[in-house]
């Protein structure tokens, strides 16, 4: 089978290539990381599919970084939460600021995608300042880098420290709410159970260990 790839910023080209090959009768899988329907390729390929009426598109669910990163940290998204991308390539920064303020003022747990890049080095610090207008400085935050990949790392900090964290585009950031707390070595929003191990900066979590503490909902 042929493996075809395009560089960053050529997603539409990749979608058209996949649809064109499918139109010619080939069985094609368009692969992206995480869940194709969350900041992924499902949306553009479905829009472009109107130009390829003979192609049937099937979207296969995956695990987005909010889910897989949450499992590493424990259970930070056990209740209502919001996901916000800090990338302004497709969304104006002013819109991102309004959305951050809205979810922070409502005390959602917040998952941040694309927290920083070479061209957007200040986005995470600016986002932290916005959230600090509504959330307490000691709000528990966490981060996971290279989720599920070699070199996976994770850690925790307070919201007052988040703006100084050296994130990158492979990092997913989690910001808790007023109820978020640390349970043993993992953290939870009211309820969750987890297994934790640490070696250096590597952290992991998983279900089903009855010997570890349980954070019970009120």
Language-model features and meaning:
Residues 3-5, 57-59, 83, 141-143:
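Conserved beta-strand scaffold positions in the cores of enzyme catalytic domains, especially
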Residues 9-14, 65, 89-91, 148-151:
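A short acidic, often aromatic-flanked loop/helix-cap motif at beta-alpha or helix-coil junctions
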Residues 26-28, 105-217:
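A contiguous loop/helix-start segment that scaffolds small-molecule binding in enzyme catalytic cores
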Residues 10, 14, 41, 92, ...:
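General structural feature for long, well-ordered alpha-helical segments within catalytic domains
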């Amino acid at each position: 089978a042929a493996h075809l790839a395009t560089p960053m910023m050529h997603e539409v080209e990749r979608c058209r290539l996949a649809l064109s090959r499918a139109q010619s009768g080939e069985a094609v899988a368009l692969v992206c990381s995480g869940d194709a329907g969350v900041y992924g390729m499902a949306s553009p390929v479905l829009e472009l599919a109107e130009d390829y009426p003979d192609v049937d598109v099937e979207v296969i669910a995956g695990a987005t970084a909010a889910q897989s990163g949450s499992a590493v940290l424990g259970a930070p998204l056990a209740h209502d939460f919001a996901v916000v991308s800090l990338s302004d390539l497709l969304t104006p920064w002013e819109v991102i600021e309004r959305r951050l303020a809205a979810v922070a003022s409502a005390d959602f747990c917040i998952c941040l995608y694309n927290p920083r890049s070479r061209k957007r080095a200040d986005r995470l610090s600016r986002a932290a300042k916005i959230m600090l207008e509504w959330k307490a400085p000691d709000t528990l935050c966490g981060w996971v880098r290279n989720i599920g990949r070699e070199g996976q790392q994770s850690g925790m900090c307070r919201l007052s420290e988040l703006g100084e964290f050296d994130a990158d585009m492979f990092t997913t950031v989690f910001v808790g709410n007023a109820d978020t707390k640390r349970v043993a070595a993992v953290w939870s929003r009211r309820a969750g159970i987890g297994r934790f191990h640490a070696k250096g900066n590597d952290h992991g979590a998983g279900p089903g260990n009855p010997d570890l503490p349980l954070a019970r909902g009120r």
